[in-house]
Amino acid sequence: MSSIACQLSFVRSTLPEGVKLVAVSKTHPAEAIRAAYDAGHRVFGESRPQELREKHEALPKDIEWHMIGHLQTNKIKYIAPFVALIHSVDSARLAEAIQREAAKCGRTLEILLEIHVAEEETKTGWNMAELMEYVRTAPFARMPDVCVRGVMGIATNTDDGTAIRRDFMELKRCFELLQPYGVQQFVRSGTVAIIKSRRELLNEYLEEIDRLRAESDEEGSKSEK
């Protein structure tokens, strides 16, 4: 079993039922994605539209591609014909540009509205008051080719579990306020998808695999002698 397959197997074993795992494949070559695909994984996230398009063209067509990075309006055209879900929609301008590209492609594009819940000002996302104002407007109501699947947010970059939970509780509160306006799901996102303790367990698991492989190779060398 490859290292990638081992990691996927471990992470899946830690997830509750009904959770969809998006493997972040940005900056990784097509060969690494193919290894994950051969291990049974089908959902991948990319952050650069042109790179995403190239990988879509080179890899199997049953892959479900997610656009997870910041998306510029002039780059939507590269991914609109095939992308499954656009994360990080953080402005009215971007949402309405996605609507225009979706109409050109003749397909419905699914999106997540990104809400700023972290302590860092560098994090992107809607201010909740501004988003609540926008979802009550006619332009938001007139996006027939855009389906708002839910909200997402990136928690504060910290090992403090209390702070992370606070951020996601705030995101859940925002989601509940938006439900009457057609927002369907609550989606947690960010680097806390695997919490610190699970990362440590994964590292220990992979180190044990490497140790067993080394022992096996050593025994094989002795047998040959």
Which residues fall in each region the model found?
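Conserved alpha/beta-domain cores
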Residues: 1-177, 181, 189
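Long, contiguous binding/interaction regions
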Residues: 176, 182-225
